């Protein structure tokens, strides 16, 4: 990737490993791994594959995510 773009990545810890995905990008880009680092590396690889397949315009976000929060709510 010549023109690097900073993306916010959510990494969730589950009982069977970690799942990672970028915030604010249309389409399904997911990484997974047994560790935090493996999930992050896997999602970075998935993003590169997405770019190679669909082009940089596929990552264009109309309004970049400034911050991401995790909250709990009773329903």
Give residue ranges: language-model regions:
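Intrinsic disorder/low-complexity segments, especially N-terminal tails and targeting/processing regions
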Residues: 12, 30-32, 63
């Amino acid at each position: 990737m010549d023109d690097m773009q900073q993306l916010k990545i959510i990494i969730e810890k589950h009982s069977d490993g970690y799942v990672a995905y970028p915030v604010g990008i249309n389409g399904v880009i997911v990484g997974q791994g047994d560790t935090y680092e493996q999930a992050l590396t896997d999602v970075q690889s998935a993003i590169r594959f997405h770019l190679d397949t669909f082009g940089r315009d596929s990552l264009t976000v109309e309004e970049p995510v400034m911050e991401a929060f995790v909250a709990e709510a009773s329903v």
